[in-house]
Structures are given as C-alpha cells and as structure tokens.
Amino acid sequence: MKPNFSKGLLPAVVIEEGTKEVLMLAYMNEEAYEKTLKTKRTWFYSRSRRSLWNKGETSGHVQHVQSLYLDCDQDSIVVVVKQVGPACHTGEKTCFHYKII
C-alpha cells in the first residue's frame, strides 16, 4: 500500500516510539516520503520555503524512523521515530506544548 499524493502534500504526524507522544506535524510530498523510506530519517516539505528539509540536519535533533503507518484513505501518515533531543525548534520536547483546555 502506498500514499496517495495525487492531491499534493500529505500531513505527517510524528510520534515517539516508546511513549506514543505526538512530537510534531509536518507535510510530505512524494519526494520527502521516498527520502524518508531510503534514509530512515524524516524528510518533509516546507510550504513556506517550498523545498525539502531533513529534520535535525542543522540542530542535530534527528528523528530515526522506526515505522510508518498510512490511514484508511491513504492521505495521512504517522511516522514513529526515536527522537534525538527536542523535536520542536523552540527547544521543547514536542511542538504541542501549549495547553488550551
């Protein structure tokens, strides 16, 4: 089974392998997906820069891909990783650190 990229970018929810904690949400195009499969590190597509980026390439806070899951419509991906350092560019463990309720 493969993701359906016919409508463009797919959301990729990144979770920590041991805790299943949600670390971040990013987007993948087909090239980012293929690079992720090949390198076992996360690659995403930046909508603002309109280019690929490798998580942790500059910070060293890389994500080692353990498994990938595809949803029932083949248009969303869950990426299970072993995170090195914080996932968020702010230095927080997860990008979801602002509690609303």
From Swiss-Prot:
Keywords carried by this UniProt record: Amino-acid biosynthesis, Cytoplasm, Histidine biosynthesis, Hydrolase, Magnesium, Metal-binding, Zinc
Binding site for Zn(2+): C72, C88, C95
Cofactor binding annotation: Binds 1 Mg(2+) ion per subunit.
Catalytic activity: 1-(5-phospho-beta-D-ribosyl)-5'-AMP + H2O = 1-(5-phospho-beta-D-ribosyl)-5-[(5-phospho-beta-D-ribosylamino)methylideneamino]imidazole-4-carboxamide
Origin superkingdom: Bacteria
Cofactors demanded by this protein: Mg(2+); Zn(2+)
Pathway(s): Amino-acid biosynthesis; L-histidine biosynthesis; L-histidine from 5-phospho-alpha-D-ribose 1-diphosphate: step 3/9
The enzyme's E.C. designation: 3.5.4.19
Gene Ontology biological process terms, A to Z: L-histidine biosynthetic process
Molecular function via GO: magnesium ion binding; phosphoribosyl-AMP cyclohydrolase activity; zinc ion binding
Enzyme class, broadest EC rank: hydrolase
GO cellular-component term (any): cytoplasm
Binding site for Mg(2+): D71, D73, D75
Cell location: Cytoplasm
Pfam family, one: PRA-CH
Function according to Swiss-Prot or TrEMBL: Catalyzes the hydrolysis of the adenine ring of phosphoribosyl-AMP.
Binding partners and assembly: Homodimer.
Family: Belongs to the PRA-CH family.
Matches recorded under NCBIfam families: PRK00051.1
Name this protein carries in UniProt: Phosphoribosyl-AMP cyclohydrolase
Source species of the chain: Bacillus thuringiensis (strain Al Hakam)
